[in-house]
Amino acid sequence: MKFIKNLEIGGLLLYAKLFRKRIPLFVSWSLTNRCNLHCRYCEIPALKSRELTAEQVFKVIDELHKLGTRVVSFTGGEPLLRKDIVKIIDYAKRKGIYVKLNSNGILVKKRIEDIKNLDVLQLSFDGPKEIHDKQRGKGSYDSVIEAMKIAKANRIKVYFNTTITRFNVDNLDYIFSKIKEFKIPTSFQPVTNILFCTKNIGSLYPKKGDFREAIKNMIKEKRKNPYILNSYNSLRYMSNWPLSSRINCFAGKVAYRISSDGGILPCNRTMDKSFGYNCLKGNFKDVLSKKLDAVCNGCWCITALELNYAFALRLEPILNIIRLDYLK
């Protein structure tokens, strides 16, 4: 994120906090539930629902921008399955919105011309080939590496996200070495019982001792590896896994989730709850006057954790976000 954009977002964040205003500054938007993989811990493809048309998406983007949205993360499913993704990305960019897209990498080579306007392409990277493919599907490791190289060659900034399970908890050193080799900022989070996870998610949990030891090592590694995205605050929070604690949550205050059918939610942990709001049935502005808060006992989503700490005006996580612009 460029300095001026950081300054604008920081100002809006501070305004929202000091004056207790609800601003949809950050929006995570599932454009589709369709996916061309079936990861072991995800059941999103089983969530059948309609999708907004490109014209409907444009209308929502117009309103979001007027209300203060400056960062949109397009996700799914696999958003590159939408044939109109280039129109959606380019429309958001013309509004001055910072656009991130989450992908499994399979379609990046085919759709590279359609995503050149992205600010960030985030890819899943779970470890050595045999482990990554075990968690996400045969051939997925090669797809991620190819997608990363093609995106970088086209001057698209790439991030990785790693989901820690019992299969890769002992292989994080491999990931540390690879992200330094590739120079890819990477976030880490535990596999967790979120609302669209597979029913046997517990079988993928790492042992508590193994996970906590891995986080301890990650804290040490971060001192010499600038490509670990997690702030020290979030790593210390994660070191208590699986015991979670409530933290001040930004969801429904400065961040919102839009589901593939246009439903408006505080975050993706509330996807099984109907708040009765939909982009197609009214104005997003009306939602801001309502109390649309997520109620949970804690959070293991790294993006949410980092934004929670930033909203709480914790200096280290804020500086950790800003430094990404200067990471080579």
Protein language model annotation of sequence segments:
Residues 184, 226-328:
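Accessory C-terminal segments flanking Radical SAM cores
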Residues 95-98, 119-120, 124-126, 130-255, ...:
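Radical SAM enzyme [4Fe-4S]-AdoMet core and its adjacent flexible, acidic
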Residues 115-116:
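A short, aliphatic-rich alpha-helical micro-motif
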Residues 40-43, 132-133, 269:
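A short local structural element in Rossmann-fold oxidoreductases
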Residues 57, 211, 284-287:
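Hydrophobic/aromatic residues in well-formed alpha-helices
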Residues 49, 79, 106-108, 128, ...:
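Residue-level marker for beta-strand->alpha-helix junctions and adjacent short loops that shape enzyme
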Residues 2-111, 325-328:
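Conserved alpha-helical substructure of the radical SAM core
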Residues 24-26, 159, 296-301:
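Short, solvent-exposed beta-strand edge segments and adjacent coil->beta transition regions
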